[in-house]
């Protein structure tokens, strides 16, 4: 059986990042309509998510809160944070080998780090969602994060998508009406555009990163 790993929420200035793993047969994933989460509507993602839970041999995920993201971004180590939790997920879900959607501009470098950390057969790819298990993991990560964001919005009100490019998100940050623990203070948006300070990076990137 093959494992796939992907994340959701790497780039937002508000809320957690979620990394997920799915282990299963490729044919099973294709039959239930798995594809890259970005190509599915929220309703379709929810429906496929429930099917993934039924057919997969293993599904697991980790939620990484803004404070921990900030701690790594402040040292230019966002990829290292992803690698740490990806390795943990690999060790929790047995498979013959694992495909990972690489956050690093050099997938081989990221792959080597995971092989060293886990001792498992790992293949890191750009555009890993072409692998059904990675696409399934992207759906799981996205659904879990979306549910957490909806719960947060029930508590604090609408703040848009949470991404730095969203005017509604920027407005809420300017107004200072977001709980501090929900904000990624190291993002450049927080200090550069909003003037709240503690800023470092536009979207947590370092020179080895490939995604926002």
UniProtKB/Swiss-Prot annotation:
Spans through the membrane: none
One term of GO molecular function: manganese ion binding
InterPro entries the UniProt entry points to: RNase_H2_suA, RNase_HII/HIII, RNase_HII/HIII_dom, RNase_HII_arc, RNaseH-like_sf, RNaseH_sf
Cofactor: Mn(2+); Mg(2+)
Cellular component GO terms, alphabetical: cytoplasm; ribonuclease H2 complex
Cysteine-cysteine disulfides: none
Gene3D superfamilies membership: Ribonuclease H-like superfamily/Ribonuclease H (3.30.420.10)
Highest taxon listed in the record's lineage: Archaea
Catalysed transformations (reactions): Endonucleolytic cleavage to 5'-phosphomonoester
Biological process (GO), any one: mismatch repair
Binding site for a divalent metal cation: 6-7, 101
Subcellular localization: Cytoplasm
EC number(s) reported in the record: 3.1.26.4
Location of the RNase H type-2 domain: 1-199
Keywords, in A-Z order: Cytoplasm, Endonuclease, Hydrolase, Manganese, Metal-binding, Nuclease
Co-factor binding comment: Manganese or magnesium. Binds 1 divalent metal ion per monomer in the absence of substrate. May bind a second metal ion after substrate binding.
Function: Endonuclease that specifically degrades the RNA of RNA-DNA hybrids.
Entry's family note: Belongs to the RNase HII family.
HAMAP family, alphabetized: RNase_HII_A (MF_00052_A)
Protein name per its UniProtKB record: Ribonuclease HII
Gene that this sequence comes from: rnhB
